[in-house]
Amino acid sequence: MLWENTEHSASEATLQYTMEPKAYENRFLPYDVLTNLAHVTMLHRQGFLDDGELAALRNALTDLYHEADEVEGEDVHTFVEERVTQRTEAGKRMHLARSRNDQVFVDTRLFMKDAAIDLAHRILDFADALRTFAEGKNVLIPGYTHQQQAMPSSTGLWASSYVDALIDDLKSLRATYRIVDANPLGAAASYGTSLDIDRDLTTELLGFSQKQHNPIYCSNRGKQELQLLQTLDLVMLDVQKFAEDVINFSEDQQFFELADDYTTGSSIMPQKRNPDILELARAKAEEVSAGKEAVRRIIGKLPSGYNRDSQQTKGHLIEGVDTVRATLDILTPLVESMELSDDFEVDAGIFAAYTANQLVTEGMPFRDAYHEVKSSGEYETHDEVAEPVHQPFGDLRAFWADEREAFDAMSERLLTAD
């Protein structure tokens, strides 16, 4: 432990209880190296490190980035500092003008930026799969209200409704990303530092669009994590509804046929082709929502400034990101392989409103036409298929492509700078 000495140490039980799971710490290792590279570059610029010390620190950090993939010891921050110090005495200067707190904050922001960009591209892939299905496999099916056949619809109109929903999710993710895209490094323990540091420089080096101005607000950890989880909860809300629809439309209504690759069998019933993926997606949506709610409750009653309670948000954040990523990765090829069935029936009653409208075009008042159709039970049908329709999203595709390019370029610059 970096803080331990002969006068103050903690029991093994205390240390074990307060340490983060290693799997979580491993995820933050590359981001911690990048933030250290930016920090020591700034310290050198401000005169706290000489040229030789900066070179030694840069060499040690870049080697660690490429060689280490598993954290040992207390946490990722201690691991990086100790490994660098084993290589060079300058490692003892690396923590100057910085707290463990703002190390955590800035690493988490980079993790969230990277995750948001990655998930946005997966959402786009899912939307593309649905759009392709909507345009290429569009047939007349009934539309439902109150879980009853109600009016004419189409597979294309249905699938493109989820494209529309995912575009809104991408807009929400972009708004969240712009809030997350602020540099908290320099907040130190919650109140800044008396040393002359350059927060604008670290903001530029780490590719943030702005710095987080108030150090206390930087330390009120959890709000940005909550905002990202809220957005992911919206994505999974759409996933949940989609899964329910496909289960119903492939089992009860027989509109769709799922490929064998995306179903499972029964240990006792040979005929079964179970939609386990879709059922698990419904459940995993609840897990993401529960993680969001847990973060809300963890941070909800904390006073301002840093509190260790907020450490517990990390696991919910990582698990939420991983769950959404895995779900999108399996649903996209499921949609790509989904076929239309030719073994379903359409109740002629779905044309009731259309029949009433036809009578209106012939001069009958709508209410009279309504009652005429209701009492006669006779319907005029048609075979027109509703076209897919959704809002455009080329600007969102371009935005996320630009952000991926910028994030990767930031990493490359820090790792290869002279």
At which residue positions do the language-model features occur?
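A helix-coil-helix interface module used to build multimeric assemblies
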Residues: 1-192, 197-203, 265, 278-280, ...
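Charged, flexible cofactor/metal-binding loops and thiol motifs
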Residues: 109-124, 135, 141-142, 148-301, ...
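Short amphipathic alpha-helical segments at helix boundaries and their inter-helical linkers
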Residues: 62-75, 224-228, 376-392
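Glycine-rich cofactor/substrate-binding loops
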Residues: 1-35, 90, 269-418
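Generic alpha-helical secondary-structure signal
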Residues: 56-57, 205, 358, 372
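A structural signal for small-residue-enriched, beta-sheet-centric alpha/beta enzyme cores
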Residues: 100, 212-216, 348, 356
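Charged/polar positions within long, soluble alpha-helices
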Residues: 41, 45, 66, 85, ...
